Amino acid sequence: MTKIHKGVYVTLTTYGARLKSVHSTIRSVLRQSELPEKIILWLDKEEFKKEELPAELSSLTGERFEIHFCENMRSYTKLVPSLLAFPDKSFITIDDDFEYPGDLVEKLMKGAEDFPDAIVCSRGRIIKYQDCDFEPYPNWTLLDRKTEAFANYCILPLGYAGVFYPAGALHSDTCDINSFMSVAPHADDLWFKAMGLLHKTPVAVLPLADSMGMATIDGTQDNALYLTHNAGDGNTEQMRAIVQKYPQLLPFFRSKAYPLITTDFGAQEEINDREKIGEFAASIVNEIRESAIKLESRNIFLSQKLMKLAQKVRPQGSLINAKLAEYEKKIKR
C-alpha cells in the first residue's frame, strides 16, 4: 500500500499555454512511490474559468488533486496562497514545466526525517557573498554532490526541482504581497530563502543524482522565468533589494559561520578559498555541539554525526565526548 504523508501538500501554479500541459506534471506526482496528502494547483481567477479547463487536467481532480483559484501573484502563486489557506501544513513546491522522478516525494520526506525542521531541496546553489556584496548570480555555485549537503545560511533552494517547507519554517512576512512584489517580483526563490533565514531555518540539499530523472515538458520553455526577468544579474539585484528592506539579514551573510556547509558529516567545507576550514569550524564548534543536542530526541544518528564533527575540532571537549558515549550506548540498544 502506498504511503501517504499526512499534513504534506504539494503545491504549484501554472499560467498561459502551460495550462494545456500541466496535467503531465500532476500525473507525475500522482504516480509517486510515496504520496502527499493533497496536490493543490493554483490558477489565476481572472485568467481561467473552471468550466474552461482542459479535460486532461480536470479529469485528474479528486481526493488527492484539487484545483483552486486565487489572485495572480506571479511565481509566488505556487506557495503563498497555500500558506494562507493551509497555515498548519507542510508543503512541497514544484514547477509546472517538468515531469518529476517517481520518488521525488519519498526522497524529500526522507531528507526531512534526516534533517528535522530544515527546508529540504532537490537542488540548491551557494549564495556567494564577499566584500560586503553579493557576487553575480551566475557565480552562485550549483551544488552537485554525491551526498547530502547542509548549511545554516548559505544554501539557496531552487524551486523548480522540488522544495520541502516544514510547517512554520518561514518568517511571518512571507505572505506580504506588497513587500515581495516591491523588492523581488520575479525572484520567489530568493524571497523564500530570505524568509527562511529570518526564521533561522537551515537548508539541506539532496544528492544531485536524486533529481536527475526530471524531464522538461515539451514546449514549456519559451517564456521561462530564467530566460526573461532573471537573466544575467536580475536575481542579484533583487537579492540586494531584499537585504535593503531587511537589514537584519546582514549579520547572517557577514557571519564567520556563513560560508560553511556540511557534506559527508566528517568535515566542514568552506565555500571560499581564502581561509582555512579549521578557523571557521573552531569558531562555530559550540553551535555544532548545541545543534546535536537539540536533535538528539528526534534523530540520534544525525546528532552523532554532528557531535563527531565537533569532536574533530575539539577532541578533548568533555561534554562532546560524554555525549558521543551516550549516543553510542543508545544506538547499540
Task: Report each predicted region and the residues it spans.
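Short beta-strand-to-loop acidic/aromatic patch adjacent to the donor-nucleotide binding site
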Residues: K89-E99
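C-terminal catalytic/acceptor-binding lobe
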Residues: K3-K6, S21-S24, S179-I277
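Short, acidic, metal-binding catalytic loop of nucleotide-sugar glycosyltransferases
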Residues: T25-E37, K45, S59
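N-proximal low-complexity "stem/linker" segments adjacent to membrane-targeting elements
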Residues: M1-R31
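Active-site-proximal specificity loops/subdomain of glycosyltransferases
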Residues: W42-K89
